């Protein structure tokens, strides 16, 4: 089971009373991998509001009547009325926000009583990758974690371990706290390992001594993958929070 399938499972996709569609906001949906896992897992009807800053979701999901693309800046309040959603998934969002606690509080606002927020983040400082040079790998990972890439405004390589502290931003109930580290044996473009390697190259680019060593390091990863010796993992942290149910009348 991969990351997105785990998130779908943690979302507890129970059909609401009366059989209406489960209303879900998938924040920073990207290509739609979490949305796809939710559609495959849900036992009943769902409506996914796929929220991102740009329309990069896969074409088949873009045209799926169960998916509603929403363009929004996640530093702004979420584009939903109060208490209209059953589930919110926030995956690798918090590190890029000006105020992660405000984000969690706003997720609380849009959830119905009894609704769930699945707050998940990779903790990039836990990156494990096979290589020929342990010392260089440690140095490059540290550089990657400490550097904000030029293509984003903010980053925090330690965000995974900070998620539980964000839960106090609103009067949520903590349902579960989980960690896992998926094992990746391939170094394909757009894989998590490939994205980390790209981040390493960007972080080292301005260091005349380190940049060529980083390039050689990535070439080593490709060689390891070709030889069947490549291994990559990073710890993911997932905190499931519930907006308390409304008191009985």
Residue map of PLM features:
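Conserved alpha-helix/loop element of class I SAM-dependent methyltransferases that forms part
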Residues: 1-21, 37
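A short acidic, Gly/Pro-enriched loop at the edge of an enzyme's catalytic core
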Residues: 76-88
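A short SAM/SAH-binding and catalytic strip from SAM-dependent methyltransferases
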Residues: 86-99
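A short glycine-rich, Lys/Arg-flanked "PGG" loop and its adjoining helix->strand segment in the class I
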Residues: 101-113
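Conserved catalytic/acceptor-binding region of the Class I
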Residues: 118-187
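C-terminal helical/coil "lid" or tail adjacent to the Rossmann-like core of SAM-dependent
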Residues: 176-231
């Amino acid at each position: 089971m991969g990351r997105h399938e785990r998130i779908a499972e943690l979302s507890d996709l129970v059909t609401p009373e009366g059989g209406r569609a489960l209303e879900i906001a998938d924040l920073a949906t990207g290509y739609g991998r979490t949305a796809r896992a939710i559609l495959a897992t849900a036992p009943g009807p769902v409506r996914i509001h796929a929220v991102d800053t740009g329309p990069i979701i896969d074409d088949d999901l873009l045209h799926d009547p169960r998916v509603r693309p929403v363009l929004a800046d996640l530093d702004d309040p979420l584009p939903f009325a109060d208490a209209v959603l059953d589930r919110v998934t926030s995956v690798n969002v918090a590190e890029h926000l000006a105020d992660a606690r405000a984000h969690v509080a706003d997720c609380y606002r849009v959830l119905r009583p009894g609704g769930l927020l699945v707050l998940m983040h990779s903790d990039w400082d836990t990156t494990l990758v096979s290589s020929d040079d342990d010392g260089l790998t440690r140095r490059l990972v540290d550089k990657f974690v400490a550097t904000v890439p030029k293509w984003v405004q903010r980053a925090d390589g330690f965000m995974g371990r900070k998620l539980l502290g964000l839960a106090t931003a609103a009067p949520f109930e903590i349902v579960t706290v989980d960690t896992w580290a998926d094992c990746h044996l391939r170094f394909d473009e757009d894989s998590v390992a490939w994205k980390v390697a790209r981040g390493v190259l960007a972080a080292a680019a301005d260091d005349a001594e380190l940049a060529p060593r980083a390039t050689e390091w990535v070439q080593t990863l490709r060689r390891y993958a070709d030889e069947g010796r490549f291994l990559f993992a990073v710890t993911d942290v997932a905190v499931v929070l519930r907006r308390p149910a409304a008191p009985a009348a």
